[in-house]
């Protein structure tokens, strides 16, 4: 039986690259700003 190895956890993903995590730092805000200017539908994970 095969094993699922690379699942990824939602909590970790949200905490590191979620919207609120991005807004906490200056560079994170730059990321959001850049994605807004490019017209991205999804700004953060």
Curated annotation (Swiss-Prot):
The keyword Ubl conjugation does not apply. One of its GO terms (cellular component) is ribonucleoprotein complex. Transmembrane segments: none annotated. Residues 23-45 are annotated as: Disordered. It comes from the Bacteria. GO terms for biological process: translation. Keywords: Ribonucleoprotein, Ribosomal protein. It holds the Pfam family Ribosomal_L34. One of its GO terms (molecular function) is structural constituent of ribosome. The keyword Methyltransferase does not apply. Belongs to the bacterial ribosomal protein bL34 family. This is Large ribosomal subunit protein bL34. It comes from Cyanothece sp. (strain PCC 7425 / ATCC 29141). The gene is rpmH.
């Amino acid at each position: 039986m095969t094993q699922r190895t690379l699942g990824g956890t939602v909590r970790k993903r949200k905490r590191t690259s979620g919207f609120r995590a991005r807004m906490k730092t200056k560079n994170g805000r730059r990321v959001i700003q850049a994605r807004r200017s490019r017209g991205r539908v999804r700004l953060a994970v």
